[in-house]
UniProtKB/Swiss-Prot annotation:
Cross-referenced InterPro entries: Arg_biosynth_ArgJ, ArgJ-like_dom_sf, ArgJ_beta_C
GO biological process: L-arginine biosynthetic process; ornithine biosynthetic process
Stated name of the protein: Arginine biosynthesis bifunctional protein ArgJ
Top-level taxon in the UniProt lineage: Bacteria
Disulphide-bonded residues: none
Originating organism: Neisseria gonorrhoeae (strain ATCC 700825 / FA 1090)
Pathways per UniProt: Amino-acid biosynthesis; L-arginine biosynthesis; L-ornithine and N-acetyl-L-glutamate from L-glutamate and N(2)-acetyl-L-ornithine (cyclic): step 1/1; Amino-acid biosynthesis; L-arginine biosynthesis; N(2)-acetyl-L-ornithine from L-glutamate: step 1/4
Family: Belongs to the ArgJ family.
MF-aspect GO terms: glutamate N-acetyltransferase activity; L-glutamate N-acetyltransferase activity
Gene: argJ
Length: 406
């Protein structure tokens, strides 16, 4: 069950001028499930995207990468669930291209203007014929419906919106959806994220902004430490709000727009953790006073992805030596353990290389029983900090993944 996460209504997710959404039941996932989504993009829009670092990246990832920078510009994104089209060799690419061609015919653009995305079971052929047959049957959809259509093991559709001033006079809107519940780990995971904004941004600048936003949001979460074959995060800028184009990172509007979109993306990223497979708790791990941000993130991830730490949280067991052990093996060079302080929420648990004299088991138990917990580690060796978001590891995670294909 998702941790403090509820489904957004259509009214909470405003339309973005220049974007049209469509969904259908293609029969790829399971009969009766909406499993196909098409995001139609107005001509003149720009698109930025980042993808998985998994060497076995899926066929649609290869195709999407090549179509992203095509001089004709992106006009559509087509997303299927139920099949990842990964580990499918040359035929997988042929199938992905066939889907692009069919989607292009549907909306009246070139095949190279369509970016394909897939999520689901790996090492199974993509039933491209089912997707192609369903495309003409697609119906207009709202953002909340599109969010549900891209789900796999998710239990709650993930969507969010933002509105704010960018520049002196223009109000910018942005709405996004994401999916992900398991195989979640930085760079990125079994996660798909799509954000659309009516701001006007040049493609090179939008690409850089997309990379920065992904690093600050989706690359700060972990559910199980597995990096998927299909991760993709996309930002579409339609330019329909009449502002002049942001074509330089030195433009003050760049930082304003990035802040707005970063806030939206972080909500989506945290929603993925809140809906982690079998999750019962949402945990924030913050490492402070590190020498570098990379060092801080490295230590935070060591604690956040430890199965022993995560199962202790599930059991509400203040066996907090597991956290100290994780920081110890995080490979922080020349770490002086006598300087390290560890807090559970605001309770000092460890200092001077051991248990704090003021700490009691009852204090730890009280915090561990909550459904949202913050772990704070102070290394006292610099000014850098990093925050990572994770969840506990429950019996539910094992059951969901053991039964995934049944």
């Amino acid at each position: 069950m998702a941790v403090n996460l509820t489904e957004k209504t259509a009214e909470q997710l405003p339309d973005i001028d220049g974007i049209a959404l469509y969904t259908a039941q293609a029969g790829v996932k399971k009969p009766g499930h909406t499993d196909l989504t098409l995001i139609a993009v107005a001509a003149g829009s720009t698109v930025g995207a980042v993808f998985t670092t998994n060497r076995f990246c899926a066929a649609p990832v290869h195709i999407a990468k090549s179509h992203l920078f095509d001089e004709d510009g992106v006009r559509a994104l087509v997303i299927n669930t139920g099949n990842a089209n990964a580990g499918t060799g040359a035929q997988g690419r042929i199938d992905a291209l066939a889907v692009c061609a069919a989607a292009a015919r549907q909306i009246g653009c070139k095949p190279n203007q369509v970016m394909p995305f897939s999520t689901g079971v790996i090492l199974e052929p993509l039933p491209a014929d089912k997707i192609i047959a369903a495309l003409p049957k697609m119906q207009p959809a709202f953002w909340n419906e599109a969010a549900r259509a891209i789900m796999t093991t998710d239990t709650v559709p993930k969507a969010a919106s933002r509105e704010g001033k960018v520049g002196d006079q223009h109000t910018v809107r942005a709405t996004g959806i994401a999916k992900g519940s398991g195989m979640i780990h930085p760079n990125m995971a079994t996660m798909l994220g799509f954000i659309a904004t009516d701001a006007k941004v040049s493609q090179p600048v939008l690409q850089l902004m997309t990379q920065e936003i992904a690093d600050e949001t989706f690359n700060t979460i972990t559910v199980d430490g597995d990096t998927s074959t299909n991760d993709s995060f996309v930002i579409i800028a339609t330019g329909k709000n009449s502002q002049s184009e942001i074509d330089n990172i030195a433009d003050p509007r760049y930082a304003q727009l990035k802040e707005l979109l970063c806030s939206l993306a972080l909500e989506l990223a945290q929603a993925i953790v809140r809906d982690g497979e079998g999750a019962t708790k949402f945990i924030t791990v913050r490492v402070e006073n590190a020498k570098t941000c990379d060092e801080a993130r490295q230590a935070a991830y060591a604690a956040a992805r430890s199965p022993l730490v995560k199962t202790a949280f599930f059991a509400s067991d203040p066996n907090l030596g597991r956290l100290l052990a994780a920081i110890g093996y995080a490979d922080v060079a020349d770490l002086d353990t006598d300087l390290v302080e560890m807090y559970l929420d605001d309770i000092l648990v460890a200092e001077h290389g051991g248990r704090a004299a003021s700490y009691t088991e009852a204090q730890g138990q009280a915090v561990m029983s909550k459904d949202e917990i913050t772990v704070r580690i102070k290394l006292h060796r610099g000014q850098a900090a990093a925050t990572v978001y994770t969840c506990d590891l429950s019996h539910g995670y094992v059951s969901i993944n053991a039964d995934y294909r049944s």
